[in-house]
């Protein structure tokens, strides 16, 4: 049973609905041997089920809405509690997200008789093999603390992993490992952690989300050009395109010990 009162010490009075993205990518090159990564198995358990189990064990989470290929998801998620709701995918990432949001909003309205556009939700992806209920609760609590500091709650708060927390997964001593691209800040390197708390009804420029996701591998110059050009074609996109160009130029200049700066 999920608590109806806040037992986590956060500013959120009730558990959050979670939106879990497990859609099959329309770009075949992003599939893994032709397969949706949600269904890859680790220790005999599909990745998507691992994430769902962590979410339903978290005190900060109420219902879990999983969006993706419904028939396949219902098979790998069979036997889980009624708090888990499977939603048929609608297309690209943004369309899938809204399909799950609409399902969550409809269920909330059926139970409470009102809509609440300020209600926060948790958003995450299906490919987080190391996720745990404790980590989810910690993240939600941190977001609640940040929300509590401001007069108007944030539209979205994103999880960030700093380089120091990921170094133990680097290849070393002849073992295989994982190397991922980072965003370069003045005080260090960091990357988004594919987990967010947001209020989707308050989020502006949502087309930017799909554009950024489609061309997110910004270390590839082909994607950088496509990303910049796509921003130019969207309302309000000139500033986003200009910041993208500046960031890429700065990153290029910082390589090889920053010799271009000297």
How should these model regions be labeled?
Residues 78-120, 130-131, 137-138:
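Short phosphate-binding loop-to-helix
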Residues 124-126:
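Active-site acidic Asp-centered loop
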Residues 34-52:
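Short catalytic helix/loop segments, enriched in acidic residues and glycine
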Residues 54-61:
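Short, acidic, metal-binding catalytic loop of nucleotide-sugar glycosyltransferases
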């Amino acid at each position: 049973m999920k608590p109806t009162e806040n037992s986590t010490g956060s500013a959120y009075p009730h558990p959050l609905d979670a939106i879990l993205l497990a859609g099959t990518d329309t770009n075949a090159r992003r599939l893994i041997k032709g397969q949706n990564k949600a269904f890859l198995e680790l220790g005999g358990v599909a990745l998507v089920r691992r994430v769902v189990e962590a979410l339903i064990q978290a005190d900060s989470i109420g219902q879990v809405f999983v969006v993706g290929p419904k028939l396949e998801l219902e098979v790998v998620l069979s036997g889980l509690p009624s708090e888990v709701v499977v939603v048929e995918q609608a297309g690209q990432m943004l369309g899938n997200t809204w399909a799950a949001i609409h399902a969550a909003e409809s269920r909330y309205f059926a139970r409470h008789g009102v809509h609440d556009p300020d209600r926060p939700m948790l958003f995450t992806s299906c490919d987080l093999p190391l996720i745990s209920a404790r980590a989810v609760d910690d993240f939600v609590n941190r977001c609640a603390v940040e929300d509590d500091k401001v007069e108007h709650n944030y539209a979205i708060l994103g999880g960030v992993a700093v380089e120091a927390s990921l170094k133990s997964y680097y290849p070393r001593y002849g073992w295989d490992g994982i190397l991922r691209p980072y965003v370069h800040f003045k005080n260090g390197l960091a990357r988004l952690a594919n987990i967010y708390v947001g209020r989707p009804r308050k989020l502006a420029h949502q087309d930017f989300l799909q554009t950024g996701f489609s061309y997110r591998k910004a270390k590839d110059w082909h994607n950088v050009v496509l990303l910049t050009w796509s921003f130019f074609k969207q309302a309000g996109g000139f500033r986003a395109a200009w910041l993208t160009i500046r960031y890429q130029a700065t990153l290029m200049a910082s390589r090889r010990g920053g010799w271009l700066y000297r």
